[in-house]
């Protein structure tokens, strides 16, 4: 049995569906998945997609993971608590299970550090087919005079998204191109709902507005895979950063922020503040376009801001209260 972990339920479902489609087999037979409250696998399943939490739970009853001969840990760069615990567990398990094959995959992983951690494990680089992606910087801070005083008020993120969509439409007219789909990264559900309301009120012609976040029902999530004659604007959290590839995206609008779980020592509670993302996350977002044709990534912050950001996001284990773990 091949076990393949994903950090989110939405990704486990969509990857299982794609692998089953590639192999020409019904989902739930040779290829299945298991997430919380849902198990679409059986005794004949040979490839099992699951969240990393499900595999961790299985270690309670099967300490040596004897059901599996191969474990694939995907999106390892996210360094969530579950992923770090899983990687630590597998490292201690390998001397006891030398026959177990462990594959760690990621697009923006720190290769040397991970390889060294697993006793200089071999590194295999798989280059996907990508097209060139141009980067535009459109910071929210508007004009300043020579003394540094603002001539105009700063834009809100919603206003900047609308202005950027207008700029994209003008660019397409000048280049005589058909409307392309746009993926907009926002920090959370509330920001997505606010932006969706604003865009619907703007009554953009031949444009479909689609929200995308982890708590959406599977039926709602499937809407992003359906074609649309005009332009689709997908408003997504960082669930679309790595876990899900939205097809046909030509433009990415990156707000540069995400909700990042962090423990407050002062308040003694776990919080979800909106913070600036790392360079690795920004590059992941940029990579969402340029899959099927040349793309453009529009960042709603300056190039200086990007260059000053940390290379990687802090591992969750460094920003979480471990007392309850």
Residue ranges of model-derived segments:
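P-loop NTPase motor module signature
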Residues: 1-325
């Amino acid at each position: 049995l091949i076990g393949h972990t994903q950090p989110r339920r939405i990704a486990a479902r969509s990857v299982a569906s794609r692998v089953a489609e590639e192999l020409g087999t019904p989902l739930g037979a040779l290829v299945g998945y298991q997430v919380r409250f849902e198990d679409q696998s059986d005794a004949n399943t040979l490839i099992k997609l699951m969240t990393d939490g499900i595999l961790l739970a299985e270690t309670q009853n099967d300490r040596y993971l004897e059901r599996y001969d191969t474990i694939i840990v995907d999106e390892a760069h996210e360094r969530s608590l579950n992923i770090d615990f899983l990687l630590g567990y597998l490292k201690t398990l390998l001397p006891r299970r030398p026959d177990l094959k462990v594959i760690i995959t990621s697009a923006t992983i720190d290769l040397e550090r991970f390889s060294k951690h697993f006793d200089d494990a071999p590194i295999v680089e798989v280059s996907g087919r990508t097209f060139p992606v141009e980067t535009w910087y459109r910071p929210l801070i508007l004009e300043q005079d020579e003394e540094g005083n603002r001539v105009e008020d700063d834009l809100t993120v919603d206003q900047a998204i609308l202005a950027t969509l207008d700029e994209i439409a003008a660019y397409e007219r000048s280049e005589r191109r058909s409307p392309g789909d746009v993926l907009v990264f926002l920090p959370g559900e509330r920001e997505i709902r606010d932006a969706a309301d604003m865009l619907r009120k703007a009554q953009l012609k031949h444009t479909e507005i689609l929200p995308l976040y982890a708590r959406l029902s599977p039926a709602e999530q499937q809407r992003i895979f359906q074609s649309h004659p005009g332009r689709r604007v997908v408003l997504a959290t960082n669930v679309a950063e790595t876990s899900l590839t939205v097809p046909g995206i030509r433009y990415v609008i990156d707000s540069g922020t995400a909700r990042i779980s962090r423990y407050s020592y002062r308040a003694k509670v776990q919080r979800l503040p909106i913070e600036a993302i790392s360079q690795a996350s920004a590059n992941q977002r940029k990579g969402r376009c340029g899959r099927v044709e040349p793309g453009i990534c529009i960042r709603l912050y300056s190039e200086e801001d990007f260059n000053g950001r940390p290379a990687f996001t802090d591992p969750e284990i460094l920003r979480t209260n471990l007392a309850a773990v």
